[in-house]
A protein has these predicted regions:
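N-terminal signal peptide c-region/cleavage motif recognized by signal peptidases
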Residues: 15-17
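Extracytosolic ligand-binding ectodomains
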Residues: 4-8, 20-398
Length: 398
């Protein structure tokens, strides 16, 4: 476990007593995959993003004494749960950030509600965080499986990909992504021919890809992420699947995945994202600073950690407290204009509503540099991208 203190400095004998009396101690825990298939899309980059948010918020000058912890949940719910309990019970953590891997995130959401903390989830995709397992202490940033499906799934089906076969990671996120994309495909007039589920994480996709190939579907939908998606695409190319006429749909695809594959292999793939480093001046400026520290451009998960941390600290400052439900209620009190996500708001169920974007990976000829990888094809309004709120999760009712 790593610990970083970004707190109040000694300001002299006269200033220090007043500062000590007024300062609010805030402990943030960045909980994610630091060594496995999701390490590139979250990992240390999310710690850096949280640190940048604390610095850019100027927390010290505003009387917030912020400490950042980080740990590797290894994509295992039991490991993530144990860390979360230890953080809340022994380390005084006020909010847990990032938490990719939906099975881990759902477990941590329950513990957070029990302990009165805040979960600012930027990494997980399951819609259950704001539906079946919603809590007044959960805020779901960045994306979810419904938004991914409404972007990539709809675009590919309407472009002629009428029949689908899913290759799905066998855990909560994969199941949710397959389910939401199936709905969108069928609503658009397409048909799902079948699915096969692979262990999470996996390295050998040969038998699963052969089943998908044998289905004869127009589109093989990859309902997985990170290293699993990269490996599946590489192996599909080796088997000649796309060369034979079937298309791949990478339903959750990150800039780090495209970079790992290279434009030659990934060109033409469509993807849905909440953020791209080159989308506007503000994104470019922040991403350049991030790259100086991390050595790569940020993913939308990294951007989400930064944005969520900024909004959380603003809420703590506004109410002068780190009490979980009170902070989240303050975050829901008014819309925000975020430098990375634009205009948005935290809905009563904890779902953050902001625009999503459909991108297509550029060809090597179209790309002007190492990270010049996306061309924007469409904007999906936040109100259309995410599922409507269900009554059971409307925490504005008290």
């Amino acid at each position: 476990m790593m610990r970083l203190i970004l707190g109040t400095a000694a300001l002299g004998a006269l200033a220090a007593p007043a500062l000590a009396q007024d300062a609010i101690d805030v402990t943030l825990g960045v909980l994610n995959d630091r060594s496995g298939v999701y390490a590139d899309l979250s990992g240390e980059g999310s710690v850096i993003a949280a640190r940048m948010a604390v610095e850019d918020f100027d927390a010290e000058a505003k009387g917030l004494n912020v400490e950042i912890l980080s740990a590797d949940h290894q994509n295992k719910p039991d490991v993530g749960s144990n860390i979360a309990r230890q953080w809340y019970d022994q380390e005084g953590v006020d909010a847990i950030l990032d938490v990719p891997t939906s099975s881990v995130a759902l477990a941590v959401a329950d513990i957070t509600a029990e302990k009165g903390g805040v979960l600012l989830d930027s990494g997980a995709g399951s819609t259950e965080l704001t539906r079946g397992q919603c809590h007044p202490t959960t805020v779901h940033w960045t994306y979810d499986t419904a938004a991914l499906a409404k972007g990539t799934g709809k675009a590919i089906t309407e472009a002629g990909g009428e029949t689908w076969f899913f290759l799905t990671a066998d855990y909560a996120f994969g199941h949710s992504l397959e389910e939401e994309t199936t709905k969108v495909v069928e609503e658009a007039g397409g048909e799902v021919l079948g699915e096969v589920r692979h262990p999470f994480p996996a390295t050998d996709f040969s038998s699963f890809l052969l089943q998908a190939q044998g289905s004869g579907a127009d589109v093989i939908g990859l309902a997985n992420a990170g290293g699993d998606t990269v490996s599946a695409i590489k192996q599909a190319s080796e088997f000649g699947i796309t060369q034979a006429g079937q298309s791949l749909a990478a339903l959750l695809f990150f800039i780090t995945d495209v970079h790992a594959l290279g434009a030659q292999t990934a060109q033409g793939l469509q993807l849905t994202s909440a953020f791209y480093w080159d989308q506007d001046d503000a994104a470019r400026e922040w991403s350049a600073r991030f790259e100086e520290r991390h050595g790569s451009k940020p993913t939308m998960v990294h951007a989400g950690v930064y944005s969520a941390t900024m909004q959380y600290l603003a809420a703590v400052e506004a109410i002068g407290s780190t009490e979980g439900e009170a902070v989240v209620a303050q975050m829901k009190a008014a819309p925000f204009d975020d430098p990375l996500f634009g205009e948005g708001y935290v809905r009563a169920d904890g779902r953050v509503i902001h625009d999503m974007y459909l991108f297509e990976v550029k060809s090597p000829e179209e790309s002007s540099g190492e990270w010049d990888l996306y061309e924007q094809k469409a904007t999906i309004a936040g109100e259309d991208a995410f599922l409507p709120m269900i009554d059971e999760c409307d925490f504005s009712r008290g």
